[in-house]
Amino acid sequence: MSAGDDQIKAVDVRWMDRPGRIAGWRIRDNLIDCGPTTTLPHLLHALDGWRPKRLILTHIHFDHAGAAGALTREWPELEVYVHRRGARHLASPERLEASARRVFGDEFDARFGGLVPIPEERLHPLDGGETIDGLRIADTPGHASHHICMLDESGWAFVGDVAGVRLDPGEPVFAPTPPPDIDIDQWLASVALVAEWRPTRLGITHYGVVEDPEPHLAAIAEDLRREAKLIRSGIGTDDYVSVMTDMLGGGGARERAADYAMTVPLGQNYAGLQRWLERHGADSQV
């Protein structure tokens, strides 16, 4: 274990009442990501009275940042740090929530719950290049234009969704590619940036600690290229879902594939890739 590891803890918010789906990260006086509003009781229970000074959000997707506004009501002293491109949506979340409700329909409330506005005076926009309590901030677009990653002085990197989804060690690593602003070229550059840091461990939201970052980062880069090749082939939604289900379930473990598909709905993955192809495919180097 490296210096400072004893101050770093994954916080399981038990999304959809199941463990091992969404992790926040407790590090010194900071909470990195907080999960959706629906998991707020689990988050507070897991924190067991501990109160951070700062909430630092890797990006504003609901599974990472949904509870942020509710936490500012719970903890009046809490300051929230987020990419500049996402800050205004947290101050005035009505359009963001309405858009998500159109996508998820009747599932929205069960999956995420509503957003509470964050007072602008408690929002701190980030551009990348800042250092916050030993956490070096980097602008890392690709999964989202408003995504940041953090390299801690301990050697840990907290990477949100840039390093993809891998629910348990030894399982496949794959890229969550929901609409609207997937950019595979930018994403690969962000993965390369994190790899250049040579982190000792990764803290990923879905899910937990990656003890050996180098092969994991290579695996997410490989999956991004595979996804680009798939969508360029003209594959349809149903065939894409079938291919990914086989990959995630190891060709037979359908229940495990379903766990991944609940965490990242495969139909939305397809829609995000299709949008990327239409917007960036002609200019992409992938």
Language model features: what each stretch is:
Residues 3, 90-138, 145-214:
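Metallo-beta-lactamase
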Residues 230-286:
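C-terminal regulatory/interaction regions
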Residues 213-222:
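Histidine/acidic-residue-rich catalytic or RNA/ligand-binding cores of hydrolases
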Residues 40-85:
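Active-site metal-binding motif and surrounding structural segment of the metallo-beta-lactamase
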